[in-house]
Amino acid sequence: SAASDVYKRQGAWGELEVSSDEHLNLHMAATCLHYGQEAFEGLKAFRGKDGKVRIFRLEENAARLQSTCQGILMAELPTERFKEAILKVVKLNERFIPPYDTGASLYIRPLLIGTSAQVGVHPANEYMFVVFVTPVGPYFKGGFSTNPYVIIREYDRAAPHGTGIYKVGGNY
């Protein structure tokens, strides 16, 4: 599956690049490897009954990625660039989107990582935004059914001023 890459160097985001390479070339001192300078999202593209492809919560995922970036002092990817990359990768991989009646979808993984080679705890100077996709089966294998769970809205799993509210690898 094709991936799209966008790099931020010298304070500006570069042009969208498309690649079929499944490997990233990183410096061993990249901040994503040592200081947690990484953020990701997860979206799905579904094929509708009418054959049209729909992407679930595109705008909301762009906003959440930006919120995560603010929270861990990473460069924020503009919403339009996020959407452009997602739409491009989905279009290039449309043939892998499962048929409507299967309950399956095309999983979309946007990933933003700090790539500067630096030692010391401070934000990266360079970033790479990558999007890759893979077909996945239904999330709920047995279909949708009710469960006897309680939702408690007053509880926060995150430590005060911690990173628990952000979509970063350290929380998984």
Regions found by a protein language model. Give the residues of each.
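Extended, Lys/Arg-enriched charged tracts that mediate electrostatic binding to polyanionic substrates
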Residues: D101-I113
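Short helix-terminating capping/connector loops at secondary-structure junctions
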Residues: P99-G103, G143-F144
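Helix-start/capping segments and mature chain N-termini
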Residues: S1-L92, L111, Q118-Y172
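Charged mid-protein connector segments
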Residues: R95, P99-Y100, A124
